[in-house]
């Protein structure tokens, strides 16, 4: 597996993965627009030309927010999400970011365990943040 910065050739596969993994997915056009966003950093995990996972963030001015992370269902439980989060943290730190914040569904125990293992701590809660189904988001933060 290789972790690369998102390029135009990856956008269609990332959009397909977004539709597969989320009830309220980003459009292909929205993902493509991130290529020209100087505040954005998106990474993809690629195996044999196939995007098996991705992660996206935005930074303003030295604080970063994780926008999305997803791994194809056929490739889960192999450490891909952890590798993507770790690579993102490293890249953001090199770019001068001092922290990374994210939201996670309060019921997403596997993700919460992974983020805790990677050094994220609870920073707050957003009631009814998610739709389909309606659910609170936990705000997690890691100092880089």
Residue ranges and their predicted role:
Residues 103, 121-137:
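Conserved catalytic-core motifs of GNAT/GCN5-like acyltransferases
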Residues 115, 120, 140:
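Conserved active-site tyrosine of GNAT-family acetyltransferases
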Residues 2-74, 78, 85-87, 91-95, ...:
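Acetyl-CoA-dependent GNAT
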Residues 66, 100-104:
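Conserved hydrophobic beta-strand within the GNAT/NAT acetyltransferase core sheet
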Residues 136-144:
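Terminal substrate-recognition subdomain of acyl/acetyltransferases
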Residues 85, 108-111, 128-133:
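Short glycine/proline-centered loop/turn elements that form peptide/ligand docking sites
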Residues 72, 76, 103-107, 132:
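Residue-level recognition of the GNAT/N-acetyltransferase active site
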